[in-house]
Amino acid sequence: MTVIRKKHPLIKIINHSFIDLPAPSNISSWWNFGSLLGLCLIVQILTGLFLAMHYTSDTATAFSSVAHICRDVNYGWLIRYMHANGASMFFICLFLHVGRGVYYGSYNMIETWNMGIVLLFAVMATAFMGYVLPWGQMSFWGATVITNLLSAIPYIGTTLVEWIWGGFSVDKATLTRFFAFHFILPFIITALVLVHLLFLHETGSNNPTGLNSDADKIPFHPYYTVKDFLGVLILLMAFMILTLFFPDILGDPDNYTPANPLNTPPHIKPEWYFLFAYAILRSIPNKLGGVLALILSIVILAFMPLLHTSKQRALTFRPITQTMYWILVADLLVLTWIGGQPVEYPFIIIGQTASIAYFTIIVIFMPIAGMIENDIMDLD
């Protein structure tokens, strides 16, 4: 068996990735989220595949087909709610995974980090298009509002929007192409994940100290396979509690009303995992400025290696930057809350303040804190 594992052309790739992979001996549970994201992706692809067998991407029947899945298909309600809430679990793991990367300075592995940002954009695009498919009120108006943002692009904006819509409004052509893209993107994401892992295994994993751990490595199996399995059990338990007891808690009641182009919902808002970016978008009165801020709120992650001023990699031994980091986390929670509130006083000013704070902390305060900590170390 050992010979096959190490010599077979296909099996040895798996062996070098998940079995004999040298891993730091001190990585904590914050390193579990990579495998949990893999699990989420598998769950989403499988549940999505079964949903696609019964779903019809036509404006006349899309809403009814989702109702049919929930009422008439064996365990259709479970598959549908697992898929909807699986997206939420996916984003919870994603945000924690990115947050871990920022905290422990994993962005210094530039290829892995940049591929992660590409993955983040791909997952966000997939989730957005998936939200349109049930063809409820929030699906329709969410698609209208978000795609309309492209009209802010000078000169070609309006043409681009109509090209994406396949007409002069969000209609049958839009729904059909969104379904096609929503189906294909997870497989593209799977390929990107393999590239992400390829880059990671070129450098090896980071660890909580931020120091080089080449002198102290252990095999991935059995140590981290068992550790990851515990994470999997906890995630599945949380996931099934959410799906079976509170399936609609993260959804919008408006999406149980069929799409009606003649009736606008009182508050158009995306799913909870986009609210922080939506709040940044709304905080700028200018349309193009808002769109640029929205894109920059994610793209700014790519600049983190350039903004790293400290002599230390991780925040483990850097209390000043740690404080900045947790203020940033609190700020993102405020932005998420604001994104779900109506555009009126005092929410407008809170959103604008939180948006300014978001960019200021990353671009100004965290690099300055790093330099101050360098000076403190030099005093010793």
Swiss-Prot record:
| Subunit structure as annotated in this protein's UniProt entry | The cytochrome bc1 complex contains 11 subunits: 3 respiratory subunits (MT-CYB, CYC1 and UQCRFS1), 2 core proteins (UQCRC1 and UQCRC2) and 6 low-molecular weight proteins (UQCRH/QCR6, UQCRB/QCR7, UQCRQ/QCR8, UQCR10/QCR9, UQCR11/QCR10 and a cleavage product of UQCRFS1). This cytochrome bc1 complex then forms a dimer.
Annotated binding of heme b566, by residue: H97, H196
Tell me the compartments it is located in: Mitochondrion inner membrane
State any GO CC term: mitochondrial inner membrane
KW Mitochondrion (keyword) present: yes
- Protein's name in the database: Cytochrome b
Chief place of localization: mitochondrion
User: Could you tell me which species this protein originates from?
Assistant: Microtus arvalis (Common vole)
